[in-house]
Amino acid sequence: GAAGVVDPKTGAIAYANEIMPGWSGVQLGPRLREDLGLPVAVVGDVQAHALGEAHWGVGKGKFSVLCLGIGTGIGGAYVENGRVMQGFHGAAGHMGHIECSAAAGIPCACGRSGHLESVASGTSIGRMYDERFGRVDPSRPSVGRDVNDLCRAGDEKATEVIYDAGFALGASLGSLANILDPEVIVLSGGVIHQGPDWRSQTWKDSVHEGYASQALDPLQDTPILIGSLEGDAPLIGAAEHLL
């Protein structure tokens, strides 16, 4: 699995934002085929992650799985009947770059503004805290883990930021569910698996409240699950894609 938008026909990196300078345009698939002398199939990293969870993780046995990977950025993928939806350009699943009202006017790493990733990724959680309350450590920008540690200690300001990020995430999940109607929703990635505090009651409540605010009535009970494979998911999913 590779970060960025992978050309489904060639395996080249068709697009990557400024978080990954120099990655866009890399002929990954062709170069690996040449260097290894073997057949190579390249899939997006979160698409691989979703395949892993859908086939061998918490989504095993489910007809359709909507998976979001939340870390430095936010990616996603949709698996139905065992197949990941890549889209014509390979860009399907870039759910961090859907419009989010809570992010209105906030620049996104992709060069646009108002995207979910700008308020719900680990990087954005740190930035939001700094903008509202000042840096946790004056010597450097805050990151999501800093805010999580404060929240764990009962800090009301940190709890507010994490709640707002969770609500924005949940509301976007509700909108996506209205389009895709998945059997289950799976959350995974670095932010989710940093520790149990990311799955605290405050965070769970905010995600579910955001989801309930947007999902249609028949979708209100769609399970929102935490991925079970953690860092192994994209490795397992990449193998599943090749097979």
Put a short name on every predicted segment.
Residues 74-79:
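Short beta-strand scaffold segments in enzyme catalytic cores
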Residues 11-24:
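A charged helix-plus-loop insertion that forms the helical arch/lid used to bind
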Residues 19, 90-91:
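Residue-level structural signal for beta-strand termini and adjacent loop
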